[in-house]
């Protein structure tokens, strides 16, 4: 009976890890791009940034509690998960993008969800010229089904950010908004 709380904790950790990792990751092999499991609870994560404007889309980003402990100037720890929702921008009857009173694009329907997850050694399977530390990328349809994308394009876009930004776009903006910038 004394070990019941410990047993419960071990079981809870096993269940939580199985939700995030793919079967290949659970069996000890390193996951590859496109093999992450859709994190169904990501809306409960702290907001990384919201309302990020693109020419024809609006993005909302979430960072799991492990990653949210990171301080400015640090790399995100193993176990970090960054989720990006990409929304279509709303159009009027004439096909023009609608803007709110603030002059920003208005969100329409959710188009897709991209996930970056980091863990020890996970970047080993990435091509040498496209290594983004130990981040792995996956893309999903709004319903959580896998979306086939060119992950080399994801890696190429994040590569110029380098180790200083841990290959994460808007790294400095996040910490400035969070109030932890130096």
Question: How should each PLM-predicted stretch be described?
Answer:
Residues 19-20, 157:
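General secretory precursor processing signal
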Residues 28-50, 54-55, 73, 77-182:
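Sequence context surrounding c-type heme c attachment/ligation sites in exported
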Residues 1-9:
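Bacterial N-terminal signal peptides that target proteins for export
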Residues 8-18:
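Bacterial N-terminal signal peptides
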Residues 20-26:
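Sec/Tat signal peptide C-region and signal peptidase I cleavage site
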Residues 55-67:
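Short, structured beta-strand/loop micro-motifs enriched in basic residues and often containing a Trp
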């Amino acid at each position: 009976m004394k070990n019941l709380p410990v047993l419960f904790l071990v079981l809870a950790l096993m269940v939580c890890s199985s939700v995030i990792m793919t079967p290949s990751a659970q069996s000890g092999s390193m996951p590859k791009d496109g093999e992450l499991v859709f994190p169904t609870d990501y809306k409960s994560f702290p907001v990384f940034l919201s309302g990020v404007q693109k020419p024809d889309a609006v993005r909302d980003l979430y960072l799991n509690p492990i990653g949210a402990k990171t301080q400015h100037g640090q790399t995100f720890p193993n176990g970090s998960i960054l989720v990006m929702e990409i929304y279509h921008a709303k159009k009027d009857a004439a096909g023009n993008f609608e803007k709110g009173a603030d002059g920003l694009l208005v969100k329409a329907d959710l188009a897709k969800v991209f996930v970056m997850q980091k863990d020890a050694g996970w970047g080993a399977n990435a091509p040498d010229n496209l290594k983004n530390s130990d981040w792995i990328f996956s893309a999903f349809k709004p319903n959580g089904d896998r979306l086939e994308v060119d992950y080399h394009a994801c890696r190429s876009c994040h590569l110029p950010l380098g180790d200083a930004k841990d290959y994460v776009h808007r790294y400095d903006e996040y910490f400035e908004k969070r109030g932890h910038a130096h």
